[in-house]
Amino acid sequence: MCSSDLCDRPYAAGVQRQRAIVIGSGFGGLGAAMRLAAAGLDVTVLERLPAPGGRASQVVDRGYTWDLGPSLVTMPWCFDELFALLDRDFRQEVELVGLDPFYRIDWPHDGTRLDFYGDIPRMQEALAELSPADAANYPAFLEASRLIHENAVLAAGRRAFENPVPFAKLLPTMLRLDAARSLAHFCGKWFSEEHIFQSMSFHSLYIGGDPYRVPAVYAALAYLQVADGVWYSKGGMYAIVRAMAQAIEDAGGRIRCDADVDEVVVRGGRAIGVRLADGEGVPAEIVVSDRSEEHTSELQSRLHLVCRLLLEKK
């Protein structure tokens, strides 16, 4: 399904850069837009909501502000690298405050409380109040988590998993590190006291993952907060959204809000643009989706999906 007004629309006079559309303005979409802008593309971000941010949006009411998504920053060097691509200094644009302790976990049903610290001996002292044996195992747990972080997370994080082959190559490493079994199983090897076990295995809940079902690769989250610290951005996480949006616009990109993408238009096996819910066609040579795989598939035209299914059956 492809209309001539979209498919054959030429570049504007004097415009020769490739056009790129990014669907969605969460951290992933904004980050992709910054990278595309740094590569010299003409970038447009299309956001369904009235303001950018996606799951990192905010609500302001009667003088109070709430972040609706993430509330803490880990691995801040990822933002450092991203902003540097556009010759910007992330730390000059967003004020980060290191947290100590990182956070506190409360169990209201029995009054237990546990503070998380970056300093390992101090953390062991806190754990020892609940279980000296588990406290003694904490350094070994962190070391095992470090190996997962460095050999699985960092190694895989910069790979494109466009087919099963790269994932298959990663499996031996995950098996060797015991990262392919559940996070709960992995943490259970080191901790038996229930509160400590829960505090070391809950990090997958950040992305809605059940510790008893997700792989132990998520144990890396426990290590990276010790390695890189846990930070709060002054003004909330939305301060980072604002800084990213500003960087995109300063690089010549555009962020269009209230722009609900209804379809990714495909011709000849390639995306050539999108069609908005109001019928407007937006042409581009590159289309990047920050939506989930399921929602992205729903955006592809029925004609394209039928053609792809027929080709796959041949």
Residue positions per predicted region:
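Rossmann-like flavin
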Residues: 108-214
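Core beta-strand elements of the Rossmann-like FAD/NAD(P) dinucleotide-binding domain
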Residues: 16-18, 276-286, 290
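Short, small-residue-biased leader/transition segments that mark boundaries at the very start
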Residues: 1-3, 298-300, 305-307, 314
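Helical element adjacent to the flavin cofactor pocket in flavoenzyme catalytic cores
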Residues: 220-276
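Generic, well-ordered alpha-helical scaffold segments in large soluble proteins
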Residues: 36-39, 186-190, 199-202, 243, ...
